[in-house]
C-alpha cells in the first residue's frame, strides 16, 4: 500500500477525512437548526434577535466611542460619519482581558473605564461590539449568556453589560447612551456602511472564533411577536450535530468549555491548529511518522494555526523526510478542507434562505491570512453554485458598533 493511501485510510479511521463532512447534509441540518432557533424551540443555534435593522440608520456628525471586544484583542476608537463615510480616529489595540487568566467582572469594567476615559470628553455615546453570546434587549443592552474562545471573566454571565458599565461610569458620564452589538452583526452593518447596501446581507466572522449574522424577515422570527425585519445573530459556533473525529474529541476535552461550541472548535483559528496537533500525535502513535518527527511533536504543548500555515508552506516540515512531509501536509490540508466544507455548508443554508445574491462581509484572520483555507472555501462556494459577493470592511466591527449606538 502506498503512503498516500495509508494516510487516507488513517484520516478516515480517526474521522477527519473531508469526505465525512457532507456539505448537502450539514447544510440541511443547519437550516433545520435555524428554524428551531427562530421558533424558540431550543436547538444548537440560538438565533438571537438584535433589534437592529439591516440598513444603516441615518447618522449625524456626532462622534461615537466604538469598542470591539474580540477573541484576541480589545480595540477602542472614536468613529464619526461625515457625508455617510465613517472616519475612525484615536484607534488603540490591546490584548483582550481574560485570555491570559481569569479576571472578575469588576476588573473588566475597570479596564473598559480606563480605555475610554480620555474619549468621554468627545462623546457620550458608546457602541460595544462584543464577540461572545448575549441576549439583546430592545434597548440595545446585552445580557451575557456565556463566553468562549478561552476567555474567562467570572461573574459576567447573566449580567446586563450596558447597565453594569453605566454604573461603573456614573461619576464620569451620568448621561451615557450605550448600545451593544455582536461581532457578526457589527461586521454586516460596517460592511453595508463602507461598501454599500445592495440586497440581502450577512456578516461572517472567521478568526479566533466563528460566527455569522444575517438579515431576517420579522415574520420568520416566530419567538418574537410583531418583530420587524432585523439582523439575527446566529451564534453559529454552537451548531450541532457534526461529524466529530477523534482529534476533535481530544481537543475538546482539554478546552475550558468542553462540549460547547463544536463548530467553532472545528473551524476557527483558536482551535484548528490544536486539532492538527492531536491528529499528528495520533499519526505518530500509528507509525506514520519518523522518530525525528515524533520527537518534535511530543515536545509541542500547542500548535497555533499560524504554525500549521507555516508547515504547509515549507518543503520539509518537522522530521524532514519525504514521507513525513507528505503525512504532515496532507493532514493539515485535509483539516483545512474539512473546515472549509463546514463553513460552505453554513453559507449554503443562509443563501437558500436569502433566495438571491448574498452580500457577505467577511472579517477574521483565518479568511484573510490562511491562504490555503481561503482558497478552499472560495473553490467550494463556486463548486456549490452559491451566489455570494464577499467584501471586506476595513474597520467593520468598530463602524458597526458606532452605527448601533446611533440607531
Task: State the predicted function of each range.
Residues 62-68, 125-127, 177-179, 201-205, ...:
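Short glycine-aspartate micro-motif
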Residues 86, 150-154, 189-275:
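Glycine-rich phosphate-binding loop of actin/hexokinase-like ATP-binding domains
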Residues 93-110, 134-202, 223-239, 374-375:
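Glycine-rich phosphate-binding loop and adjoining helix at the ATP-binding site
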Residues 78-80, 129-130, 182, 205-207, ...:
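Glycine-rich, histidine-containing beta strand-loop boundary motifs that form or position
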Residues 131-136, 184-187, 365-368, 397:
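Short, internal active-site loops enriched in acidic
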Amino acid at each position: 500500500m502506498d503512503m498516500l493511501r495509508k494516510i487516507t485510510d488513517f484520516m478516515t479511521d480517526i474521522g477527519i477525512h473531508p469526505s465525512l463532512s457532507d456539505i448537502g447534509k450539514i447544510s440541511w441540518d443547519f437550516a433545520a437548526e435555524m428554524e428551531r432557533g427562530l421558533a424558540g424551540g431550543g436547538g444548537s443555534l440560538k438565533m438571537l434577535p438584535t433589534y437592529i435593522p439591516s440598513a444603516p440608520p441615518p447618522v449625524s456628525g456626532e462622534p461615537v466611542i466604538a469598542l470591539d471586544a474580540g477573541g484576541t484583542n480589545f480595540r477602542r476608537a472614536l468613529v464619526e460619519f461625515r457625508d455617510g463615510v465613517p472616519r475612525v480616529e484615536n484607534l488603540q489595540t490591546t490584548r483582550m482581558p481574560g485570555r491570559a487568566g481569569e479576571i472578575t467582572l469588576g476588573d473588566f469594567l475597570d479596564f473598559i473605564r480606563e480605555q475610554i476615559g480620555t474619549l468621554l470628553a468627545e462623546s457620550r455615546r458608546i457602541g460595544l461590539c462584543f464577540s461572545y453570546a448575549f441576549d439583546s434587549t430592545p434597548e440595545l443592552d446585552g445580557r451575557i449568556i456565556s463566553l468562549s474562545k478561552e476567555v474567562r471573566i467570572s461573574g459576567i454571565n447573566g449580567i446586563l453589560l450596558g447597565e453594569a458599565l453605566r454604573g461603573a461610569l456614573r461619576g464620569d458620564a451620568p448621561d451615557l447612551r450605550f448600545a451593544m452589538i455582536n461581532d457578526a452583526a457589527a461586521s454586516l452593518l460596517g460592511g453595508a456602511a463602507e461598501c454599500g447596501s445592495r440586497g440581502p446581507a450577512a456578516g461572517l466572522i472567521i478568526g479566533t472564533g466563528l460566527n455569522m449574522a444575517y438579515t431576517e424577515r420579522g415574520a420568520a422570527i416566530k419567538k418574537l411577536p410583531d418583530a420587524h425585519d432585523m439582523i439575527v445573530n446566529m451564534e453559529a459556533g454552537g451548531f450541532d450535530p457534526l461529524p466529530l473525529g477523534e482529534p476533535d474529541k481530544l481537543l475538546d476535552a482539554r478546552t475550558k468549555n468542553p462540549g460547547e461550541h463544536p463548530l467553532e472548535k472545528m473551524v476557527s483559528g483558536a482551535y484548528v491548529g490544536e486539532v492538527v496537533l492531536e491528529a499528528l500525535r495520533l499519526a505518530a502513535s500509528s507509525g506514520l511518522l519518523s522518530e525525528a518527527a515524533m520527537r518534535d511533536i511530543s515536545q509541542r504543548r500547542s500548535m497555533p494555526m499560524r504554525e500549521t500555515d507555516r508547515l504547509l508552506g515549507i518543503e520539509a516540515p518537522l522530521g524532514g523526510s519525504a514521507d513525513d512531509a507528505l503525512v504532515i501536509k496532507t493532514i493539515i490540508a485535509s483539516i483545512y478542507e474539512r473546515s472549509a466544507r463546514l463553513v460552505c455548508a453554513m453559507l449554503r443554508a443562509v443563501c437558500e434562505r436569502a433566495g438571491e445574491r448574498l452580500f457577505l462581509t467577511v472579517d477574521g484572520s483565518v479568511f484573510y491570512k490562511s491562504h490555503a483555507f481561503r482558497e478552499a472555501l472560495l473553490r467550494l462556494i463556486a463548486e456549490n453554485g452559491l451566489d455570494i459577493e464577499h467584501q471586506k470592511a476595513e474597520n467593520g466591527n468598530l463602524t458597526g458598533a458606532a452605527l448601533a449606538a446611533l440607531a
